[in-house]
């Protein structure tokens, strides 16, 4: 029997580690907290739609164009995006990837970020500035699940690539 793996979902996880990343994270955290404090429109939206948490998604979603700190984050992340694109073997001849959106999510304990997709993004990711000990990770689900309604459950010890979902641990300094 020959078994081929076709159409895999490849998840990129790496540490941003560059000299001074802890200092950079402290500056980024300070700026995130300042934005949350002054973003009245974002606060109003979050009161109704993101109880206990804060997101600048609906109010300030181009942070990389508004802040030199976030512009620096974009530069650091671009290195990882390029590595991911190479690993996926995309032909980028004559094409350029640009960060279109960059926003802040602050999720204290018991705040959840529900399942959602980014249908207009080629690559979507998260950078963790700060994560509390024991926090939940980033859950990825098989995008074909709606086609598997009659499929029996997976064995508890199945290989990660056969699971219907996986959770990547959230860790400060990681790009996922």
Where are these regions (language model features)?
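Aromatic-enriched hydrophobic runs in primary sequence
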Residues: 12-18, 84, 95-96, 112, ...
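Active-site region of the double-stranded beta-helix
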Residues: 62, 68-98, 108-122, 129-133
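Catalytic core of non-heme Fe(II) oxygenases with the double-stranded beta-helix
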Residues: 98-176
């Amino acid at each position: 029997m020959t078994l081929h793996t076709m159409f895999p979902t490849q998840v990129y996880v790496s540490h941003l580690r560059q000299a001074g990343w802890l200092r950079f994270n402290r500056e980024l955290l300070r700026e995130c907290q300042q934005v949350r404090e002054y973003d009245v429109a974002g606060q109003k939206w979050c009161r109704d739609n993101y109880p206990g948490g804060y997101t600048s998604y609906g109010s300030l979603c181009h942070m990389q164009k508004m802040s030199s700190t976030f512009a620096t984050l974009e530069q650091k992340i671009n290195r990882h995006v390029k590595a991911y694109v190479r690993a996926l073997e995309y032909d980028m001849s004559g094409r350029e990837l640009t960060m279109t959106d960059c926003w802040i999510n602050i999720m204290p304990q018991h705040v959840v970020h529900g399942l959602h997709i980014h249908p207009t993004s080629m690559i979507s990711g998260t950078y963790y500035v700060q994560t509390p000990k024991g926090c939940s990770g980033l859950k990825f689900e098989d995008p074909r699940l709606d086609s598997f309604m009659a499929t029996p459950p997976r064995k508890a010890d199945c290989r990660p690539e056969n699971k219907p979902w996986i959770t990547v641990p959230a860790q400060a300094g990681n790009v996922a």
